[in-house]
Amino acid sequence: MAAAEEEDGGPEGPNRERGGASATFECNICLETAREAVVSVCGHLYCWPCLHQWLETRPDRQECPVCKAGISREKVVPLYGRGSQKPQDPRLKTPPRPQGQRPAPESRGGFQPFGDAGGFHFSFGVGAFPFGFFTTVFNAHEPFRRGAGVDLGQGHPASSWQDSLFLFLAIFFFFWLLSI
C-alpha cells in the first residue's frame, strides 16, 4: 500500500486530484476543460462548441470522435453541474463562426511577364513536337560554327547528305502539320 502511494505521489499527489472536489472533466476533442459540456449516448464527454464543429464538418459521417458510434445533436445530453452559470441547453445555440483571416500577399518584385509560376516554364507545341525542334535541326544548340569541309571524325563529314535529307523532312513535316 505504501508503495502504491509513493508511485502516484502519495495521498496528496497529483494523481489523487482526479477524484477530489477540484476534479474537472476534459473534452475528448480539444482535451481542455469541457465548457458547455455535453455527453454522448455512448458516454463520451465533449465541449458543445467542439462537438458542434465536429458535426458540421462531417455532415455525411456523423459519428463519435472516440468510438465511431452514431451521434447527432439529438443524441447528446447537456451536463448541468454545481456552480453552473448557464442553466440553458447549449445545444439550442450555435457557436459563433470564426472570422476568416486573409494574409497579405507576398511581393516578389521584379518584372514577371507571365506571372510567377514557381519555376514552371511553358513551351508551346503541336502534338508530340514542340516548336523548339528547329533548334536541333539548325544546330542552334551548337556554340561553334564549323568551317566548310571540316571532318568531324570517321563517318561524320561536315556536309553529309543525311543532314540535308533530315532538314528537308523536318521542313516538309512542319508544313504538313500546318496544312492539317
UniProtKB/Swiss-Prot annotation:
UniProt GO molecular function: identical protein binding; protein-containing complex binding; ubiquitin protein ligase activity; ubiquitin-like protein conjugating enzyme binding; ubiquitin-protein transferase activity; zinc ion binding
Transmembrane regions listed in the UniProt entry: 118-138, 160-180
Residue positions where Phosphothreonine is found in the record: 94
Coiled coil: none
Topology with respect to the bilayer: Multi-pass membrane protein
Region (Disordered): 79-110
Enzyme Commission number(s) from the entry: 2.3.2.27
GO biological process, one term: response to bacterium
Major place of residence: membrane
Modified residues (Phosphoserine): 84, 107
Subcellular location: Cell membrane; Mitochondrion membrane; Endoplasmic reticulum membrane
Signal sequence, renumbered to the chain: none
Domain of life assignment: Eukaryota
Pfam families the UniProt entry points to: zf-C3HC4_3 (PF13920)
Keywords of the record: Acetylation, Cell membrane, Endoplasmic reticulum, Membrane, Metal-binding, Mitochondrion, Phosphoprotein, Transferase, Transmembrane, Transmembrane helix, Ubl conjugation pathway, Zinc, Zinc-finger
InterPro entries recorded: RNF5/RNF185-like, Znf_RING, Znf_RING/FYVE/PHD, Znf_RING_CS
Top EC group: transferase
Zinc finger RING-type: from-to: 27-68
Catalytic reaction list: S-ubiquitinyl-[E2 ubiquitin-conjugating enzyme]-L-cysteine + [acceptor protein]-L-lysine = [E2 ubiquitin-conjugating enzyme]-L-cysteine + N(6)-ubiquitinyl-[acceptor protein]-L-lysine
Cellular component terms (Gene Ontology): endoplasmic reticulum membrane; membrane; mitochondrial membrane; plasma membrane
Function: Membrane-bound E3 ubiquitin-protein ligase that mediates ubiquitination of target proteins. May function together with E2 ubiquitin-conjugating enzymes UBE2D1/UBCH5A and UBE2D2/UBC4. Mediates ubiquitination of PXN/paxillin,thereby regulating cell motility and localization of PXN/paxillin. Catalyzes ubiquitination of Salmonella type III secreted protein sopA.
Subunit structure and binding partners: Interacts with PXN. Interacts with JKAMP. Interacts with STING1; the interaction of endogenous proteins is dependent on viral infection.
Entry's family note: Belongs to the RNF5 family.
Stated name of the protein: E3 ubiquitin-protein ligase RNF5
Organism for this UniProt entry: Rattus norvegicus (Rat)
